[in-house]
Amino acid sequence: MELWFTEYQTPTLGITCKTKKTLHSEKTEYQELAVIETEQFGRMLLLDGIIQTTVADEFVYHEMIAHVPLFTHKNPKKALVVGGGDGGSIREIVKHPSIEKAVLCEIDRRVIEVSKEYLPEISCALDNEKVEVVVGDGIKYVKEHKNEFDVIIIDSTDPIGPAEGLFAIDFYRAVYDCLKEDGIFVAQTESPFIDKELITRIIRDVKSLFPITRLYTCAIPTYPTGYWCFTMGSKKYDPLETDIDSIPDIDTKYYCPQIHRAAFILPKFAKELIK
Amino acid sequence: MELWFTEYQTPTLGITCKTKKTLHSEKTEYQELAVIETEQFGRMLLLDGIIQTTVADEFVYHEMIAHVPLFTHKNPKKALVVGGGDGGSIREIVKHPSIEKAVLCEIDRRVIEVSKEYLPEISCALDNEKVEVVVGDGIKYVKEHKNEFDVIIIDSTDPIGPAEGLFAIDFYRAVYDCLKEDGIFVAQTESPFIDKELITRIIRDVKSLFPITRLYTCAIPTYPTGYWCFTMGSKKYDPLETDIDSIPDIDTKYYCPQIHRAAFILPKFAKELIK
């Protein structure tokens, strides 16, 4: 018998992976949560049947969502991750020597607990002494903290269901207020190939709030189309002006100083989205 | 009833697309050839059940395989495409004003004929007056022509079955001899995420023959992992030294002068492949 897991990434497109076994499956207060072991990508975290991260390619997403804003900022001391209960973004954040505190605010306690059990290589820094884990609503947390963080990372699920509010202009406004006067936020904002309307709208919203708005991309095999983007809003520092020669060599598999620059260079069709 | 076409991109990974109808299907002298109409990517050309090109995302592959070498060369007049019977690479080549002649050498006459019938937006330049279409073995053609082309594009299927010889060092040696003294060739060389051994071997082979060897990448949703690479061997011109400010604006959707530079900037794990 062969088992294949299929995610329908759009109503007319799917990715299908041969599966060794289901390691965990439950219905949490918020969503269906599962960890399966696939042949191609190893262990894979699923929320409502959608691939969140896999041990084979998680490095791309987590390195790119964390190091690009952290190295754009001159001296980040305090960072917040909204969502990201698997801990991958936190793991990358604590690699930065200047970081004194990293807060994770994840709404679903079970995502954290299951990641700790089944994805130790991703969640490994959640017990780091610099890390505070808050189980709660990220929108509420952001609204209750003002002028506090150097970097905020919106490490959310897709903009349907529980994460919808994390893609709204009201939330970006709260993020602005939650950042210090030279703060930077980054949000994962889906695929430039198939989420054009969403990205165009987000860019417009962020531009209306932040003096510097940028879009950057990377290659993630298990996400729809394999091509993914992040939107950055920055109060002071421009990632295009980062002195990449000053970026220290850190332990990464995708991110490097040259990629810090190249990730912002968009193909023509994607440049149209940020006009 | 719903019809879904699934390509198994590896033994443990597949892409699946909802399909409106099969427009064409036949067994040619060389392979199974089909054109299907999918909801997500429109018309799609399949050879032996493997996606070759789709009307939705073909622009990435064809622009990147053609314009990068053509704009690296200072004054390309004569270009050869080995394979590429759909005509997409030829369509891009004839956009260059300096091109006087473009030869297509495709082994399977039916690929050309079926592309002309079902993929007119891709094959549209095959009847251009600058284009010569040769139905024949690309290896034989290259071996019989010496010191003749400015740019050679190896627009092949995967390195199994009929195209295997197009990934061999003997063929690259013949390509070297077929190029003029300042010639450049580019070959499609699969995915940096899952074809690491192949790419490492090709880079080593090309380095042993050409003074300048480069790897560049782009994002192609319908190819395995969505992240694709091309290997360039050049006798004189280095694409990293192209004066990108001198590149004229041409009608493209992915390629642009900035991408000409950025495509060669590789994430850390891919840089390992070319060491």
Curated annotation (Swiss-Prot), chains A, B:
Catalytic activity as recorded in UniProt: S-adenosyl 3-(methylsulfanyl)propylamine + putrescine = S-methyl-5'-thioadenosine + spermidine + H(+)
Annotated PABS domain residues: 2-235
Molecular function terms from GO: spermidine synthase activity
Catalytic EC class: transferase
Pathway membership: Amine and polyamine biosynthesis; spermidine biosynthesis; spermidine from putrescine: step 1/1
GO CC terms of this entry: cytosol
Cytoplasm in keyword set: yes
Quaternary structure (record): Homodimer or homotetramer.
Function: Catalyzes the irreversible transfer of a propylamine group from the amino donor S-adenosylmethioninamine (decarboxy-AdoMet) to putrescine (1,4-diaminobutane) to yield spermidine.
UniProt-recorded name of the protein: Polyamine aminopropyltransferase
Record organism: Acetivibrio thermocellus (strain ATCC 27405 / DSM 1237 / JCM 9322 / NBRC 103400 / NCIMB 10682 / NRRL B-4536 / VPI 7372)
